């Protein structure tokens, strides 16, 4: 118990240090207006306090109950634990309804098709919700630009520019549909203890350094190391594991996301128009699936998936994460939001983290962040209450708690906080270096955000699944993708 309390105290002190660092080194001093006050009682600092006009009544929405539909991830988990602090100040009760990815997608589809306003706060996936239902989301400019209301701490400029463009806008920047909430990216998880133990033997047999954090760690080396581990597991020499690697391969959104990182690492892309992967578009463009880079990436992805122990129905991201956390695999490609589960599992303290292996062009790490938006079909009173919640839920204090908590560990969406974390926590938290690098422009990859995103992903998932199961080869997959996309447009 004493050890636990010591860790809690250390984490709280660390939070104060980071916020102080932000004030002194990561942000410009901001003059507090005489007619605005801070709230929620956090330590006063020039970057992090939520402000409102002196006459603003924080309890004007007291008694209102909001339903927030959200994916069950680290951010939602921490928010569920912290939300009583928001209720205590405002009198607004928020039910954070966490659910798995597929259920979330189904319920949000039903919500906007029926226009029932069953959920007031929406977890806005830019590739599933923003691209299709932006007209059902409230324009948050109405609240952010209203001088009589609390505003986003630090303003919209405090968020990563590219993440803001992906999560908050559609086609143009006229309307703000959501505020960046989480910022997960694909990274490589690996059993550091196993790699250290067998490093010399791997070097002797493979002829290269197998370290996944090496700048020379390519997809070909990933494949070579995985095969080496599989062979030594089968021979009985390596008893700590069951598999060299696990890669997402089910007929599920996960296979498309896993392939996307491989595609970009070999210099490929889905479309030529850069707006498709940023602000998004209602227009459908010609797909590049017949390009040399695309076909090469398909072939390489099939090689990677073939390392999985058996095909069956394939693996989703949850199944891959569960197997790795149980100590079965040496490496996995997955979202960094799995760090909490991994570091609270039987492999805790034994795991290393890196950006994904390089293709012929670069290491490419798929971005998967989302925002929080307000249902435009909710009542005006609930919309105001929802805005107050968003201001609080995306504040620096809450985002830092999400990073520092035992069940947390993912990066905030604010540029200054990420910079501070990189400077202060790279040694203490083994995942920080990989997470920060994965979001850098030279390593990050943003997938298409289109009005017809559902149709596009359906085509990709179906053909990738058929290919990795051996029903079609990479050439046929590339032809099918192009012809099926053309037919739907």
Sequence positions of predicted segments:
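Hinge/lid segment of periplasmic solute-binding proteins
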Residues: 35-60, 126-187, 350-357, 423-427, ...
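Short, polar/charged alpha-helical segment
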Residues: 52-57, 73-91, 193, 460
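Short, well-ordered beta-strand elements
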Residues: 62-73, 92-97, 121
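Extracytoplasmic "Venus flytrap"/periplasmic binding protein-like
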Residues: 85-162, 197-198, 323, 330-331, ...
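Extracytoplasmic/periplasmic substrate-recognition and gating elements
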Residues: 93, 113-114, 170-174, 193-194, ...
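Periplasmic solute-binding protein
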Residues: 127-145, 161-211, 223, 247-280, ...
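C-terminal capping/gating helix-and-loop segments adjacent to ligand/active sites or protein-protein/ligand interfaces
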Residues: 171, 366, 415, 430-485, ...
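Glycine-centered hinge/linker elements that transmit conformational signals in sensory
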Residues: 221-230, 261-314, 356
């Amino acid at each position: 118990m004493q050890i636990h309390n010591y860790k809690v105290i250390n984490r709280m002190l660390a939070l104060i240090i980071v916020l102080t660092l932000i004030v002194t080194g990561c942000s410009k001093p901001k003059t507090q207006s005489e007619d605005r006050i801070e709230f929620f009682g956090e330590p006063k600092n020039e970057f992090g306090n939520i402000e409102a006009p002196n006459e603003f009544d924080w309890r004007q929405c007291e008694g209102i109950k909001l339903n927030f539909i959200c994916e069950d991830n680290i951010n939602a988990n921490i928010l569920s634990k912290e939300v009583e602090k928001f209720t205590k100040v405002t009198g607004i009760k928020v039910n954070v309804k966490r659910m798995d990815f597929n259920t979330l997608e189904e319920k949000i589809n039903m919500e906007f098709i029926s226009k029932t306003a069953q959920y007031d706060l929406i977890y806005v996936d830019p590739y599933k919700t923003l691209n299709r239902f932006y007209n059902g989301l409230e324009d948050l400019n109405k609240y952010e630009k209203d001088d009589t209301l609390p505003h986003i701490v630090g303003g919209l400029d405090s968020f990563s520019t590219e993440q803001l463009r992906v999560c908050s806008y559609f086609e143009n920047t006229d309307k703000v549909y959501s505020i960046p909430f989480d910022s997960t990216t694909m990274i490589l998880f690996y059993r550091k203890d196993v790699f250290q133990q067998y490093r010399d033997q791997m070097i002797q047999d493979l002829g290269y350094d197998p370290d996944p954090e090496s700048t020379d760690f390519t997809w070909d080396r990933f494949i070579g190391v995985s095969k080496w581990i599989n062979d030594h597991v089968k021979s009985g020499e390596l008893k700590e594991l069951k598999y060299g690697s696990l890669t997402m391969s089910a007929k599920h959104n996960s296979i498309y996301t896993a392939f996307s990182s491989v595609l970009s690492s070999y210099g490929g892309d889905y479309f030529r128009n850069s707006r498709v992967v940023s602000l998004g578009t209602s227009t459908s463009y010609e797909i590049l699936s017949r390009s040399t880079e695309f076909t090469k990436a398909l072939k390489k992805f099939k090689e990677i998936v073939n390392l999985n122990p058996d095909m069956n129905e394939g693996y989703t991201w949850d199944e891959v994460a569960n197997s790795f956390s149980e100590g079965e695999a040496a490496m996995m490609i997955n979202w960094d939001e799995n760090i909490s589960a991994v570091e609270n599992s039987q492999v805790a303290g034994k795991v290393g983290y890196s950006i994904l292996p390089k293709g012929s062009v670069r290491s490419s790490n798929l971005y998967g962040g989302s925002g929080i938006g307000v249902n435009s079909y909710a009542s005006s009173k609930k919309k105001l209450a929802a805005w107050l919640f968003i201001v609080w839920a995306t504040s620096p204090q809450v985002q830092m708690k999400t990073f520092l908590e035992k069940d947390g560990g993912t990066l905030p969406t604010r540029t200054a906080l990420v910079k501070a974390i990189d400077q202060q926590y790279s040694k203490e938290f083994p995942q920080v270096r990989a997470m920060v690098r994965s979001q850098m422009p030279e390593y990050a990859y943003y997938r298409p955000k289109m009005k017809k995103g559902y149709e596009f992903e359906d085509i990709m998932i179906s053909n990738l699944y058929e290919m990795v199961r051996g029903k079609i080869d990479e050439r046929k997959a590339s032809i099918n993708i192009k012809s099926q996309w053309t037919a739907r447009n």
